[in-house]
Regions:
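Glycine-rich phosphate/pyrophosphate-binding loop
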Residues: 94-96
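Oxyanion-binding/catalytic loops of NTP- or PPi-dependent enzymes
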Residues: 1-80, 88-92, 104-114, 118, ...
């Protein structure tokens, strides 16, 4: 059985081998691959290959395609999501969301399901090449996905000639992966409640799972769809892009290529600041032969990130209310997702739940592992 963690930024694929799960490596020996599809004059490209040409081919590169699955032109979050898109979504006469991209010399329109269909086909080709000759998959989705979004995902999987045996919530996949190898830590009758805080690229989910020795139950899930690492990166991009414009008179935010260079460097700055008090934001010849060079302290980073920190804190509080729990009901807190490595986010969780934090799960792989283990749980 193949388990697929379909993230907005990266995708990870696992396969059950005996009682364990192996992560299927890419052609470049990476454990995860970018969720990207690009079109050009000769071919479609995917993942790392699409990422390699993203700055020169941004207009034909579809980023965050999973966010558009099952949506139509009246989707209330459409305008918010547009600002993160490269190949801009358009609305057809019958209200469908389509991506317009130039492929082999002509412009074509693609539904999000079609884009994801060719992406799934690429994943399938990779695991078959690695010797896993199966079409049966379990795919995880955000818990907030409604029936029409899940159906759109199933339609995309069918395009790749795969058999989707189950679509499971990310909270279930994470809970399965967490609990399966910890059964001996729990009592047969008296449950222990674990809080999972998952802050990824585009969203934050907080959920509580009750564990006993032979069972688990997800109590509740609270999500903020626009509280992730990319939201922080965009705030910093606008701030430092504005400073650059003020100093040199040219605006890098009006150039998609410059914005991509800025975002790439800011993501590195964010990661460096998890272990350092300050670092440099340096980009040679960002625009009109002018260099960007600023020192960014962790304090300044946290001040600029304040709107997202506030949303994150509110999500933690709202999660307790929706679960009808008190901090004293929680036995442990498990941190999941790339953005929870940010020190201020960890501090906020400690303050909200009053517990030390555990980081035993691989942020990039735990959903894929849980998805693959789903049929054997």
């Amino acid at each position: 059985m193949i388990g697929i963690s379909l993230g907005s930024l990266n995708t990870c694929v696992g396969v059950v081998k005996g009682s364990n799960v192996d992560i299927i490596l890419t052609d470049t020996s990476q454990r995860c691959l970018p969720t990207l599809v690009a079109f050009n004059e000769r071919e479609r490209s995917f993942a790392d290959q699409a990422n390699f040409t993203i700055k020169s081919n941004f207009a034909n590169t579809i980023k965050y395609p999973t966010r558009f699955l099952g949506q139509t032109g009246d989707w209330p979050f459409l305008n918010e999501e547009r600002k993160y898109s490269l190949c801009q979504p358009i609305i057809s006469e019958n209200g469908e969301i389509l991506f317009e991209a130039e492929y082999k010399g002509s412009k074509d329109h693609y539904k999000p399901e079609a884009v994801m269909g060719v992406f799934f086909d690429k994943l399938k080709q990779n695991w078959i090449k690695k010797g896993y000759n199966t079409k049966d998959v379990v795919v995880s989705v955000p818990d907030y996905f409604l029936a029409h979004e899940r159906q759109a995902l199933v339609d995309a999987i069918k395009i790749a000639d795969l058999n989707c045996t189950s679509v499971i919530n990310e909270s279930s996949a994470i809970s399965i992966n967490y609990g399966l190898f910890r059964r001996n830590q729990y009592d047969e009758k008296t449950p222990k409640i674990v809080a999972f805080v998952d802050m990824g690229e585009s969203k934050t989910s907080v959920f509580f799972t009750s564990f006993t020795k032979n069972n688990h139950r997800v109590i509740s899930v609270t999500t903020d769809r626009f509280c992730g690492a990319r939201d922080i990166d965009y705030i910093l991009m606008e701030h430092y892009g504005g400073k650059f414009k003020q100093k040199y008179g040219c605006d890098p935010l009006k150039s998609t290529k410059c914005k991509l260079r800025l975002l790439e460097t800011i993501a590195k700055v964010r990661k460096i600041l998890t272990g350092n008090r300050d670092t440099n934001l340096t980009i040679d010849s960002l625009m009109e032969d002018e260099d960007m060079n600023y020192t960014v302290s962790r304090e300044e980073f946290e001040n600029l990130s304040a709107p997202i920190i506030t949303r994150f804190r509110e999500t933690l509080s709202r999660a307790l209310v929706e679960a009808k729990l008190k901090p004293s009901d929680i036995s442990s807190v498990e941190m999941v997702g790339d953005a929870v490595r940010i020190p201020i986010m960890q501090q906020v969780v400690k303050e909200a739940y009053g517990l030390e934090l555990s980081k035993t799960l691989s942020p990039d792989e735990c959903v894929a592992r849980g998805s693959a283990l789903y049929v054997n749980k």
